Amino acid sequence: RQMCIRDSCHSVQGTAKMLAEYLDVKPESMSYWCVGINHMAWYLQLKSDGVDMYPKLKKIAESKKTIAEASAKEGHYHRHVGDKFNDGVRFEIMKYFGYFNSESPFHMSEYVPYFRKTPEMIDEWHVSIRWWLEHELSNDEYYEELKKQVESEEDIPMPQGEEYAPNVIHAVLTGKLFRANLNVMNTGLITSFPHDCCVEVPCFADSEGIHPCYIGELPEGPAGLNLTNINVHRLMAKAAVTKKYQYIYEAIQLDPLTAAMC
């Protein structure tokens, strides 16, 4: 039996909230059209109350000082890394490729060969902190907290988060339309990419299911950067299916981070 899989991530909506903080606008005023691949999607349109925010965002990118000032307004990563957070990587990518990217500067720096060539560069671009490792190592503490909540007679706090899944499920069950950026197979949705890759595109969910949006061609620069990672994805998928190590060797050689380190 063939399975229909739709994968969700929080980077698109999470970054949109960060951009609202950088731009000094309300998060609920933001609208965007973000497409690409998971952890490397591009905000092709970025608006607040219908006004294009890219001129203001590109103004921030003009100097390290303005980038640092904007980064200081961000709330999520500051809870993990404090004042060391700086979004210079993504502003630099936008400077050359024209669009802001959906993934954090820490992780985005691992998808390209530009920022991790030397320890000095890693420090310069503020991507030395491995906060996600610390987050993973705290799972035992989190598990104990969950046990206490389950064993307690008090109500468990369940504030609405930013993850797409609950709203997508609600849309399918009730028919109330909801739009989410989801990861789906590229059935001709992005014509710049191979048909056998996974893409991240806006999708509409309702009682009839999940409906990915047709995108067409991406701008050549952002598409080219996506393809450097799509090549790795496809080879690793082949390695998993065929159990052939050759595909793993080829994927490692093509990985942009290999170019940064070798």
Task: For each feature predicted by the language model, list its residue ranges.
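Short, small-residue-biased leader/transition segments that mark boundaries at the very start
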Residues: 1-5
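Acidic, His- and aromatic-enriched active-site or binding-groove loops in soluble protein domains
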Residues: 6-13
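Alpha-helical scaffold elements adjacent to nucleotide-binding pockets in ATP/GTP-utilizing enzyme cores
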Residues: 15-19
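Long, compositionally biased stretches enriched for glycine and/or charged residues
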Residues: 20-262
